[in-house]
A protein has these predicted regions:
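Glycine/threonine-rich flexible loop motifs
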Residues: 15-17
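Conserved core of the sugar-phosphate nucleotidyltransferase
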Residues: 107-128
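Conserved N-terminal catalytic core of the sugar/cofactor nucleotidyltransferase
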Residues: 2-5, 13, 27, 31-102, ...
């Protein structure tokens, strides 16, 4: 199984902070949000990860060079046409199952059970 993680957005609601730091790299509990996401999915056995980058994408690449538990592929979304477009750009159109995870959201999901499901599954968590 591979994962697609879209992290191309500008994070306009977090400006001016996102003018200099990609929002998936904002620190939460001592490490970037993206690191929390990567830790959760690699613990579930996902190692092949495609990141859809755009705004400040070089920062995401630099961070991933320091992360040792995964194999990364980067796809640049040059035209911002929404989340669906970003995910579509990351698909390789193989029959391999794909886990799509947002790179700027820390969710308490059981990724092991989600991955083991024989059905297409949507993981949804309430936002307080």
């Amino acid at each position: 199984m591979k994962a697609i993680i879209p992290v191309a957005g500008h994070g306009t609601r977090l400006e001016p902070h996102t003018l200099t730091l990609q929002k998936c790299l904002f620190p939460v509990a001592g490490k970037p949000v993206l690191e929390h996401v990567l830790d959760r999915i690699t613990e579930a056995g996902v190692r092949d990860i495609t990141l859809i980058i755009g705004h400040l994408g070089h920062q995401v690449k630099d961070f991933c060079l320091t992360y040792e538990n995964a194999n990364f592929t980067f796809v640049e979304q040059t035209e911002r046409l929404g989340l669906g477009h970003a995910v579509y750009q990351g698909l390789d159109h193989s029959d391999e199952p794909v886990l799509i995870v947002l790179g700027d959201a820390i969710l308490e999901l059981d990724y092991n059970n989600l991955i083991k499901s024989q059905y297409s599954t949507i993981g949804v968590a309430p936002v307080p």
